[in-house]
């Protein structure tokens, strides 16, 4: 097994600077509180009885600290090349990958902050990560360009051992970036959840990278650690202020920043399949939410749980709509989901006609349906435990079940 002392010197420097980044994030967020409120980048917590103004878009602070850390860190992986005797050839491909990754993340932070300020529509939320992922795809094209995949064992009699996907591989990577940036944004709405799930995912990736340092792809995992270590500590600083009762909101800025950072290391670190497995709860939440996201079933602006003032606990939130406004497909999906105990449906009739009411289709509301009303802090902890369980399952698949599909 590797020892701490055997870690590359740039990684140790990265760790030290990241610890300073944690302190900076914890310090800067309250220091800028007044500036955000003065700029009207603030809002009220809908699940609290207090109507205190809370600063929003604080992900821009953790994102800025993250970028400063990595901008200052850029020379350290290439220190040997500052000494001519030790530098055989400058690793231009590594430098391009580092700069391209930072460009993609920087673009996503900027576009995420624009979303927080301008309150963009959902169709724009799909275009933003697509645009920000272009530098990432160009880096992959110029540095690697490999679009061949190893076919899983069950499909080899049909497709062979290797399959060249060509341009479809770039489409897959672009869709991965779009999914990662929006998946965290969809599973959100209660104190500490966005930053908490990102913290668990980043910790899981760090563990995975450290385990793989002895493997054949050591350089790829070292590259991933350059990003994941500072991301973990800056997110930890943000979570300190975002934990229940939240003193700040992370905003769409953080969700986009986190998602693009994960997409960057997954694509350029060549472990995108493992990355998707770490997103297991987010994938389930996305699939469960799809009927509302596609507006097959009416989707309100906010799908967060609602607070029962008497009990102080969160309960399911509902979407109410006229029954006749639901399409045949929507009616079919609702009936199937109800028969599978995935949604609660109520019918009512008023002077205006017949109405249907169903719980909003998110993982948060599904847990409340199964377990009943829960205190907000406990609900966040439960969701983070599910995220940890998802990571444990991912490691089991990656190091045990993978033998059923690939030669390892």
From Swiss-Prot:
Required cofactor(s): Mg(2+)
Impact noted for substituting residue 115 to A/N: Strongly reduced UDP-N-acetylglucosamine-dolichyl-phosphate N-acetylglucosaminephosphotransferase activity
Similarity field: Belongs to the glycosyltransferase 4 family.
Record annotation: effect of changing residue 108 to I: In CMS13; strongly reduced UDP-N-acetylglucosamine-dolichyl-phosphate N-acetylglucosaminephosphotransferase activity
Organism: Homo sapiens (Human)
CDD domains: GT_GPT_euk
Activity modulation comment: Inhibited by natural nucleoside antibiotic tunicamycin, which acts as a structural analog and competitor of UDP-GlcNAc. Activated by mannosylphosphoryldolichol and phospholipids such as phosphatidylglycerol and phosphatidylcholine.
Glycan-carrying positions: 146
Protein name as catalogued: UDP-N-acetylglucosamine--dolichyl-phosphate N-acetylglucosaminephosphotransferase
Effect seen on changing residue 264 to M: No significant effect on UDP-N-acetylglucosamine-dolichyl-phosphate N-acetylglucosaminephosphotransferase activity
Gene from which the chain derives: DPAGT1
């Amino acid at each position: 097994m590797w020892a701490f002392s055997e870690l590359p010197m740039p990684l140790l420097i990265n760790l030290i600077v990241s610890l300073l980044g944690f302190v900076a994030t914890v310090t800067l967020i309250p220091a800028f509180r007044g500036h955000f409120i003065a700029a009207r980048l603030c809002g009220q917590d809908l699940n609290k009885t207090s109507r205190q103004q809370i600063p929003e878009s604080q992900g821009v602070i953790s994102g800025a600290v993250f970028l400063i850390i990595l901008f200052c860190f850029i020379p350290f992986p290439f220190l040997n090349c500052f000494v001519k005797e030790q530098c055989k050839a400058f690793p231009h491909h590594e430098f391009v990958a580092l700069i391209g990754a930072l460009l993609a993340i920087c673009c996503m932070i900027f576009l995420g902050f624009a979303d927080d300020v301008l309150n963009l529509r959902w169709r724009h939320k799909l275009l933003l990560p697509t645009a920000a992922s272009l530098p990432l795809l160009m880096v992959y094209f110029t540095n690697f360009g490999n679009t061949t995949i190893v076919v899983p064992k069950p499909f080899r009699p049909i497709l062979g051992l290797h399959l060249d996907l060509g341009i479809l591989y770039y489409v897959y990577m672009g869709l991965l970036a779009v999914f990662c940036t929006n998946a965290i944004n969809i599973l959100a709405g209660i104190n500490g959840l966005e930053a908490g799930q990102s913290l668990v995912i980043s910790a899981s990736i760090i563990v995975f990278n450290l385990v793989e340092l002895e493997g054949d792809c050591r350089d790829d995992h070292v590259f991933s650690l350059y990003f994941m270590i500072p991301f973990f500590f800056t997110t930890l600083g943000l979570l300190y202020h975002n934990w229940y009762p939240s003193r700040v909101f992370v905003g769409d800025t953080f969700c986009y920043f986190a998602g693009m950072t994960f997409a960057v290391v997954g694509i350029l670190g060549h472990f995108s399949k493992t990355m998707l497995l770490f997103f297991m709860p987010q994938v389930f939440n996305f699939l469960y939410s799809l009927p509302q996201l596609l507006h097959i079933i009416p989707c309100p602006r906010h799908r967060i749980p609602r607070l029962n003032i008497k009990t102080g606990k969160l309960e399911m939130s509902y979407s109410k709509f006229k029954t006749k406004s639901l399409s045949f497909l929507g009616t079919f999906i609702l009936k199937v989901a109800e028969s599978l105990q995935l949604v609660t449906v109520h019918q009512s009739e008023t002077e205006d006609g017949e109405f249907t009411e169903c719980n909003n289709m998110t993982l948060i509301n599904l847990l409340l349906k199964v377990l009943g009303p829960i205190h907000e802090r406990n609900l966040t902890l439960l969701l983070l435990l599910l995220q940890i369980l998802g990571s444990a399952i991912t490691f089991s698949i990656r190091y045990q079940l993978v033998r059923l599909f690939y030669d390892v």
